[in-house]
């Protein structure tokens, strides 16, 4: 299939909605590659806790933007946008279409919504000072500087909170307002997946993560990158680390992870509803509906 004009199909939806499996099925049918737009699957050594496509799944369809950087060297939105656009444009030149998959709304908007994030380099001294502040106080500070970003960013997400404050202090502008919009050079078809049984899917997937070795993977990350790795504060890894450190037991870790994941899914659904104009797919007929939309879009 070689459409006349480049087409980007973006499959979005909350965590645990089944995007990975559906994306692979779609990609096989339309002979496309997949670009990962998940803010944590870009990191090496973070597999189980991010629900990264397995080696078998990745062997079925080419996946890009997975395992592109070390957890000890996190990248910001501007850096990701630059890397991702280069990869996507290269793929479009060869195939004429590609498939983006992810639940990270801001990352998706940076690629398909024309978002142009501020190119503010890391401010080491400022970051060091902000890291000394208690995370609750840090989030309160963000509320004062940038209420919209504070509402969108979870209080536990230290990386994004520090980045938003960094942009504010470096430019004098709110991170949420410092993003100019520019048109995307591609045709874009947005498809959404939001199954009715999402809560039970989250519960099942979280239990599977722990059974597959989330705690062991977290221990390996601690041994390799240190106990203070910022990404170890994210969902799943934060609870597993607390369990390793003897602060909570297995059942508590499981329960908190499920709760935090459900909260994330709620925020993701709100974002997609407010920021995107997706065609939402029926869970039972997602594949044929997706293919029909793609073929109709291609004409």
Curated annotation (Swiss-Prot):
Residues holding ATP: 13-20
Catalytic activity field: adenosine(37) in tRNA + dimethylallyl diphosphate = N(6)-dimethylallyladenosine(37) in tRNA + diphosphate
Residues carrying the site annotation Interaction with substrate tRNA: 104
Top EC group: transferase
Keywords: ATP-binding, Magnesium, Nucleotide-binding, Transferase, tRNA processing
Cofactor: Mg(2+)
Protein name per Swiss-Prot or TrEMBL: tRNA dimethylallyltransferase
Gene, per the UniProt record: miaA
Classification via InterPro entries: Dimethylallyltransferase, IPT, P-loop_NTPase
Family membership noted in the UniProt record: Belongs to the IPP transferase family.
């Amino acid at each position: 299939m070689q459409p006349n004009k480049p087409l980007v199909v973006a499959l979005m939806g909350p965590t645990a909605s089944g995007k990975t499996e559906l994306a692979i099925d779609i990609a096989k049918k339309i002979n496309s590659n997949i670009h990962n737009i998940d803010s944590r699957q870009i990191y090496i050594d973070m597999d189980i806790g991010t629900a990264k496509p397995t080696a078998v799944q990745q062997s079925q369809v080419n996946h890009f933007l997975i395992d592109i950087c070390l957890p000890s060297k996190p990248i910001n939105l501007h850096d990701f946008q630059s890397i991702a656009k280069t990869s996507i444009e290269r793929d479009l030149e060869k195939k004429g279409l590609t498939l983006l998959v992810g639940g990270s709304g801001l990352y998706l908007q940076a690629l398909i919504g024309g978002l142009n994030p501020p190119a503010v380099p890391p401010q080491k001294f400022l970051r060091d000072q902000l890291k000394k502040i208690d995370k609750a106080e840090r989030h309160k500070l963000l509320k004062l500087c940038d209420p919209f970003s504070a509402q969108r960013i979870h209080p536990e997400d230290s990386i994004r909170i520090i980045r938003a404050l960094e942009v504010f202090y470096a430019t004098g502008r709110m991170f949420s307002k410092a993003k100019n919009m520019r048109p995307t050079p591609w045709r874009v078809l947005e498809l959404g997946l939001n199954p009715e049984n999402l809560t039970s899917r989250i519960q099942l997937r979280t239990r599977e993560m722990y059974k597959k070795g989330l705690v062991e993977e977290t221990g390996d990350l601690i041994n390799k990158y240190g106990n203070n790795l910022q990404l170890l504060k994210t969902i799943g890894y934060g609870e597993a680390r607390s369990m390793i450190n003897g602060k909570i037991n297995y059942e508590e870790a499981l329960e908190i992870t499920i709760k935090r994941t459900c909260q994330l899914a709620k925020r993701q659904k709100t974002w997609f509803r407010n920021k995107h104009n997706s065609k939402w797919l029926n869970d039972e007929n997602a594949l044929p509906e997706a293919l029909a939309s793609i073929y109709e879009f291609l004409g």
